[in-house]
């Protein structure tokens, strides 16, 4: 199903967007004296490759190779029969097929320069078998971790990122707005149907069915009884951009008070000072390949504070008049001297 929902939009992501991103990557590669950059992708680690070429795998795995000079190419474990689909939904110079993607990628790089300097994004997160295959396929290649290089490039959202996050947030908001009814499963079904109709590539819905008992989100299987107040969380992907929104079903006055405190806290990010008095909070965003990496939060320790201009999704829990309220929405981190801002309304009718 997901494959059928993935499509390239030359209006929302024109070639110039990918060209500008690749130009920035290649400039950083020249500074770091790298001959090639390699990014791993699978159906859970989509954000690095989709950001550069628009490819989003619906299953299996692949390596994107970005030469310092030349068009990027994809080495995919998917069979040759999906070659035309990959070419249709992404902007890639060539698609190579091999079940051992690391071996083929290294052989291809080494065929042009046997001692090439190759940076691997999130080297520590690369599956060991693929890393071993790369060493076998290119024994003379100098492999290094390119995490700092790529994370610095991904830290700041460009205008296309912001536009797509706004569209994804609108889809998630409308989905949660349609989550109505007396039974939780029916509410979830209504929300998912709305998101699919609005073009979501993916939507994951989780629930906290009774906030008086437990504020943790869970995947719902079977029918679950609802408490007097409960919450739904929608995680939505659109054109490779992921956001999270949270809706708490509670007294309207309590919801308004909670939303105001949440917006005030978000405005002070990346400082955590606004979340004083909150039960818990979490800021997620894309650093490399995971679309929603935990960055900072009440339970994370030092973490990775988002830089000015970063797109993030924020979740928080707080008590208003003794009642637990969960909130969540995407936000844009302000630049120097600017406040950060939500890009979706945390209040629902």
Question: Language-model segments: which ranges?
Answer:
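Active-site neighborhoods and metal-handling regions in enzymes and metal-associated proteins
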Residues: 1-349
